[in-house]
Amino acid sequence: MKAIQLQEFGGAEAFQYVDLEDPTPGDGEVLVEVTRCGVNFADTHSTRNDYLAEQQLPLVPGAEVAGRTPDGRRVAALVGSGGYAEKVVVPESLTIPVPDEVDDDQAAGALDHGLTAMALVKRIAVIVPGESIAIEAAAGGTGTLAVQIAKAAGS
């Protein structure tokens, strides 16, 4: 399979287009043929090894993907790394079904920010329909989605 891989940390100049062996899923895992991979803040920092968790080389970046399983299901998943490849192995329990009305661009691009915004608005904030709320940094990916989720919830 084709993949973007880093042998040394850096920006886009460190990306190498390589051939790798197809990954093999183990028990409780599923192979996902990647159709889209999101690019977010964590991805750009993981390639420089200056984010939360120390990265190991060689590294195939890409934390959020959309794609198809061998049985034809459309899924999205947060994978940590490996999304910049044609195929990635994902724990079955971490796959999210993608409904027909959501395309793969939307599923992969909104996964990390969308789950974060949903958790903030639905689980942490107390939203009372009709009341106003303030969302700091509403111009960013997570903030923009948080505004939309809060509005749909009645704020």
Question: Where do the language-model regions lie?
Answer:
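Short N-terminal binding/cap micro-motifs at the start of the first secondary-structure element
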Residues: 10-17, 27, 41-43, 85
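Terminal peptide-recognition signature
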Residues: 3, 34, 88, 117, ...
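Extracytoplasmic/periplasmic beta-strand context in beta-sandwich domains
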Residues: 18, 86-88, 131
